[in-house]
């Protein structure tokens, strides 16, 4: 397994910011849902249990369904890692001092690569391919600011 860091061209910055804002919205929803369920029942939600509550979110938010799955899985992993009932909110406001940097996770089925372009959902992003991405098999990853 190898980690590749590729740079996406700057002209896609606004679209990536919008997608990162949607990711923050889903993260905050899952965080709130999990905490309310814990208070009500005394049990933690697993990523699988949350799936029925986030069903259809990909159509509303413009994110790929595998991205929603990755957000849920990452949330549960971090909640267990830090042993917290509720994690911090992810803030999208650019003027906020506590603004969360852009993070858009994806899985293999949510991403397509062809000739220096990465297609995520219905959006194409140009990138500088210094590694020759076509030689590698991408399984998971994320767009990070």
Q: Model-flagged regions — what are they?
A:
Residues 1-145:
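Nucleic-acid substrate recognition interfaces
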């Amino acid at each position: 397994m190898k980690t590749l860091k590729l740079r996406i061209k700057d002209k896609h910055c606004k679209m990536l910011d919008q997608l990162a804002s949607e990711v923050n919205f889903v993260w905050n929803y899952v965080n709130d849902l999990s905490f309310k369920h814990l208070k009500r029942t005394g049990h933690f939600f697993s990523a699988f249990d949350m799936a029925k509550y986030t069903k259809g979110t990909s159509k509303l938010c413009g994110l790929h369904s595998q991205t929603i799955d990755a957000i849920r899985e990452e949330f549960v992993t971090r909640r267990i890692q830090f042993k917290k009932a509720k994690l911090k909110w992810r803030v999208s406001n650019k003027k906020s001092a506590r603004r969360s940097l852009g993070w858009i996770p994806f899985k293999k089925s949510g991403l397509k690569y062809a000739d220096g372009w990465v297609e995520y959902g219905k959006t194409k992003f140009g990138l500088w391919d210094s590694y020759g991405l076509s030689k590698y098999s991408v399984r998971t990853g994320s767009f990070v600011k």
